[in-house]
């Protein structure tokens, strides 16, 4: 493979970040998408809660001779959760645009550090563009990990904390469920406020707290309408795909041994629960 330097990429950068870490250019639905982590980005330019954000811009065309993306969109949040970083995207031989994220932020201490282990990889996600937004959905192959299917009801106890949960949430209603829940309902709180139009993810009551200086709560606006959520849990990881990947919340948690239940505190979500084979252990 031969490389030729054309020049610095022109993507209408605001130049407030001191480092553009892990930049990658991928083509999604024939449009150039730049995904990167601007360390030190001025929050007056783009608000973010994590120590460093993972953002993207979408262009209409890529001028290879002049290394220019034109016209280019505003900055967008790639993931609304706590720990996504250094997302790497690529175009597969079959034409799909795929990406995988690092779940673990630099310069943040995690409970697993004492075991000389930090970070984990996300699910592999397929990318598409709808209405000027980048959608992310788990690749189809993940479904091979499903062991069975069970109707989701108001309480599931003693899970393995390794499962997929597909939910339908009625609009004009507030739904709250708790993953990694103990018997008293303390765990990872997910609130879908489909009256006022807001999603709230709160990890303050699940296991060992960490990175609290960057808050234990994340929020994002959502249309107050019927909503779907596809949730993946794997022991210390959660990935939540809302409305077919329009919005994603991902993060790490370190639950106590008794936090293995799923509780519903408000609303009446319906759906399907799939116990999964472990993502990380050979079958």
What are these regions (language model features)?
Residues 1-2:
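Short beta-strand segments and strand-loop junctions that repeat across beta-rich extracellular domains
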Residues 5-8, 22-26, 31-44, 97-103, ...:
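Hydrophobic core segments of beta-strands in well-ordered, beta-rich domains
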Residues 8-12, 75-77:
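Short loop/turn motifs that cap or connect beta-strands within the blades
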Residues 14-20, 80-83:
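Short glycine-/Asp-/Thr-/Trp-enriched loop segments that recur within the blades
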Residues 17, 47-48:
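Short glycine-biased active-site loop of nucleotidyltransferases that positions the nucleotide triphosphate
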Residues 43-46, 250:
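A generic structural signal for short coil/turn motifs at secondary-structure boundaries
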Residues 46-47, 58:
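Beta-propeller blade termini and top-face loops
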Residues 52-283:
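Beta-rich accessory regions
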């Amino acid at each position: 493979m031969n490389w030729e330097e054309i020049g610095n990429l022109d993507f209408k950068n605001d130049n407030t970040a001191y480092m553009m870490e892990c930049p990658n250019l991928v083509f999604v639905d024939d449009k150039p998408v730049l995904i990167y982590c601007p360390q030190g980005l001025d929050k007056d330019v783009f608000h973010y809660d994590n120590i460093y954000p993972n953002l993207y811009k979408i262009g209409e065309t890529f001028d290879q001779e002049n290394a220019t993306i034109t016209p280019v969109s505003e900055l967008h949040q790639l993931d609304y959760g706590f720990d996504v970083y250094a997302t790497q995207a690529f175009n597969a031989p079959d034409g799909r645009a795929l990406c995988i994220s690092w779940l673990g932020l630099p310069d943040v201490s995690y409970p697993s550090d004492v075991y000389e282990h930090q970070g984990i990889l996300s699910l592999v996600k397929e990318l598409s563009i709808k209405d000027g937004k980048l959608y992310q959905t788990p690749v189809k192959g993940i479904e091979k990990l499903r062991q069975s299917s069970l109707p989701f009801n108001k309480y599931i106890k003693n899970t393995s904390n390794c499962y997929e949960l597909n939910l339908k949430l009625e609009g004009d209603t507030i739904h709250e469920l708790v993953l990694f829940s103990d018997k008293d309902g303390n765990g990872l709180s997910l609130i879908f406020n489909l009256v006022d139009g807001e999603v709230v993810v709160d990890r303050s009551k699940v296991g060992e707290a960490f990175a609290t200086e960057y808050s234990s709560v994340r929020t994002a606006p959502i249309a107050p309408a019927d909503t779907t959520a596809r949730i993946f849990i794997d022991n210390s990881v959660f990935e939540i795909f809302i409305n077919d990947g329009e919005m994603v919340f991902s993060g790490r948690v370190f639950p106590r041994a008794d936090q293995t239940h799923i509780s519903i505190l408000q609303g009446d979500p319906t759906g399907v629960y799939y116990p999964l084979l472990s993502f990380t252990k050979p079958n």
